[in-house]
């Protein structure tokens, strides 16, 4: 008995034996799921079979065939899907929908014990060839996880999906375009000169001032705004709007996100409320007041202003511009900036600390400083670092 170590680091227990004069190999399981003690028990069972004239390899194959007759790829995939208890309901739905749309037609009814690497790869390559590289990459990861689950469940001895490594083109996720900070005065001038729908201009201005995500802004309700406390509370989830996809989305991090409102942001919200306050939604659609503003509205307006939203700047790029400016100023703590960006800290202890502490008072000062910085830049460009020298609210 020995432990076979593959180049990718996976480890398998193997037993060499002779049967009817032929050298054979028996798979005893995957390490560390199968411990040394477990492997020894399986070795001893195999030796007993040999002593009785039974080939343990043949018996195992026959047992596997009987065991896996009713175990299709779809059944095992759904079983694997159900083990991921930490997924949110929304994420779990998206994962299952992706499997249904892209894998189950080709693999769903296939016996999982008979699937080869080429079988698993075929539908994934079809997705890749359609240009959906990121979807293909996720399907490869999930197929590998499903087949690993099958190994761990004793349905198969080896994970053929491991051999798909490198077969699917990697997707280099592109950062959303953002303007160089020195072009902020130009951007502000174009926003001020925008002659389209006023609500669209206010959406752009507010996005720049508080740099929340598109869905966090578009699906917002007036009930989330506390004008007295100057705070916007974005909930983890919202009441879905009938017929509007993803309208239940709140904070992307799925925790309550508090957004302090500068005097400039409050002024914009008060203007919007004056005209559209009778509706539940803050940013209503152009043609239907019961539906939210389109997700393309901000970028469409930026294109009207003359910007290439794929190269120069897009609505999401405002977040990059704000983050760069706040960091460059040297005034604000990393935790305050990260919390305001609603980023999830990788370190779980750090994440818990940041979430609990909130850094709310520092963030109030920070967003007011950012709004004032934008106002100053309407006249001429001044860098965040230089502006921090003349406006440091932490010393006042």
UniProtKB/Swiss-Prot annotation:
Full protein name: Putative protein IntB
Keyword Methyltransferase: no
Gene Ontology, cellular component aspect: cytosol
Pfam families in the cross-refs: Arm-DNA-bind_3, Phage_int_M, Phage_integrase
Residue ranges of every copy of the Core-binding (CB) domain listed in the record: 71-151
One example GO MF annotation: DNA binding
Gene (UniProt): intB
Listed PANTHER family: PROPHAGE INTEGRASE, PROTEIN INTB-RELATED
InterPro entries the record matches: CB, DNA_brk_join_enz, Integrase-like_cat_sf, Integrase_catalytic, Integrase_DNA-bd_sf, Integrase_DNA_bind_dom, Integrase_recombinase_N, Phage_int_M
